[in-house]
Curated annotation (Swiss-Prot):
The keyword S-adenosyl-L-methionine applies. Binds 1 pyruvoyl group covalently per subunit. This is S-adenosylmethionine decarboxylase proenzyme. The keyword S-adenosyl-L-methionine applies. It catalyses: S-adenosyl-L-methionine + H(+) = S-adenosyl 3-(methylsulfanyl)propylamine + CO2. It comes from the Bacteria. It comes from Caldicellulosiruptor saccharolyticus (strain ATCC 43494 / DSM 8903 / Tp8T 6331). It is an enzyme of class 4 (lyase). GO terms for cellular component: cytosol. Catalyzes the decarboxylation of S-adenosylmethionine to S-adenosylmethioninamine (dcAdoMet), the propylamine donor required for the synthesis of the polyamines spermine and spermidine from the diamine putrescine. The modification Pyruvic acid (Ser) is found at S63. The record marks E62, S63 as: Cleavage (non-hydrolytic). Is synthesized initially as an inactive proenzyme. Formation of the active enzyme involves a self-maturation process in which the active site pyruvoyl group is generated from an internal serine residue via an autocatalytic post-translational modification. Two non-identical subunits are generated from the proenzyme in this reaction, and the pyruvate is formed at the N-terminus of the alpha chain, which is derived from the carboxyl end of the proenzyme. GO terms for biological process: spermidine biosynthetic process.
């Protein structure tokens, strides 16, 4: 089977609580992770919750990256979905894990868009 893309679902534990509650820093980390993976950033939207927590999305030409943080638990839920062969979602995921100072993570990789024959998609 041939996949259109790879979707990394990451559970990050033991993260730096101050980082998890800093909207500007979370946004910077997410955008930098996309760029380090070789993605082309299109749109960025992040929100700081009261009293704590940040959620955000980085829309890339190749799909998206998302994060939802729970500073009180030292936990972040991260998705990195990339289409095509040019961008490596693991580079982004590993960078995010390092920058959030996670003590450990669990991940699942899902192949998205499975076809029996290779599919040619424009710009990927």
């Amino acid at each position: 089977m041939h996949a259109l893309g790879r979707h990394i679902i990451a559970e990050l534990y033991g993260c730096d609580k101050e980082v998890l509650n800093n909207r500007e820093l979370i946004e910077k980390i997410m955008v930098e992770s996309a760029l380090k993976a070789g993605a082309e950033v299109r749109e960025v939207a992040f929100h700081k919750f009261s009293p704590q927590g940040v959620s955000g999305v980085v829309v890339i030409s190749e799909s998206h990256l998302t994060i939802h943080t729970w500073p009180e638990l030292g936990y972040a839920a991260v998705d990195v979905f990339t289409c095509g062969e040019r961008v490596d979602p693991w580079q982004a995921c590993n960078y995010i894990t390092e920058m959030l100072k996670a003590s450990h993570m669990t991940t699942t990789e899902v192949k998205r868009g499975l076809f029996e024959q290779p599919v040619k998609v424009a710009n990927l």
